[in-house]
Amino acid sequence: MKKYSFKIILLGTLVTLFTLTSCLKDLDQVPQDKDIVLADELFNDPAAYKQVLAKLYAGLAISGQQGPAGMPDITGIDEGFSQYLRQYWLAQEVTTDEAVIGWADGSLPDYHEHDWTPSNEFIAALYNRIIYQITSCNAFLRETTEAKLSGRGVTGQLLSDIQDYRNEARFLRALSYSHALDLYGKFPFVTEADEVGF
C-alpha cells in the first residue's frame, strides 16, 4: 500500500511540475550575434537585392563566404569538394570513360567503378549543394514578393530591376532542379510558396 501511494504522490508531483512550468516565449528571441543579419534588416538596403542575386549565381561557382577554408555554405565536407559545378562535373564525366581521376580522394574511385551509394561523400555533397541552391533561390523569391516590396516602400526602377532578379532566381532554381532530376530521379519539389520547415 505504501508503494502504491508513493507512486501516486510521485506521479502527482511530476504532473504538477510539468503543468506549472512554461517557456515564457524563451524561444521567440532575436539573435544577439552582430554577424547575423535578418532578412528585414538586410533588405532595407536597396543594393542588397542585387548582392543576394549575385550570391545565387556565386553558389554555382564558390563553396562559401571566405575562400578555401572558412565560412562554408555546407558543413561536413571539405570546401573544395562541395563546390556545385565541380561536383556536377564529377557526377557527369567521371562516371563515364571521358575523364579519369587517378588518385583516391575519399570515395571518388566509386565513380569509376560505378559502385556509389547515398553514403558516398561526393554524391551527398552534390545533393546537399543542389538543395542549398534551391533553398537560397526560394528564400530570395520569398523576400521579394509584391507584398514585401510594397511594405518596404520599393518603387520605380528598383522595383523593375527586382522583377528581373526574380526571373533570374527562378531560372537558377530551375537549373538546379534539372540537375537534380537528371542525377537523382525523383526529387522533392519546393517553391517559395511552401512554408519553411515541416
What residue spans do the PLM features occupy?
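Terminal processing/anchoring signals of secreted or surface-associated proteins
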Residues: 1, 23-25, 56, 137, ...
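Bacterial Sec-dependent N-terminal signal peptides
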Residues: 1-32
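Long, intrinsically disordered, low-complexity segments
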Residues: 3, 23-24, 82, 100, ...
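Membrane-proximal, proline-rich intrinsically disordered regions
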Residues: 23-84
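Proline-centered turn/helix-capping motifs that create local helix->coil transitions or kinks
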Residues: 25-28, 181-189
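Conserved, well-structured interaction surfaces
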Residues: 46, 50, 58-64, 98-184
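Short, glycine/acidic-rich hinge or "gate" loops at secondary-structure transitions
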Residues: 68-74, 150-155, 187-190
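Hydrophobic, small-residue-rich alpha-helical packing segments that form membrane-like cores
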Residues: 193-195
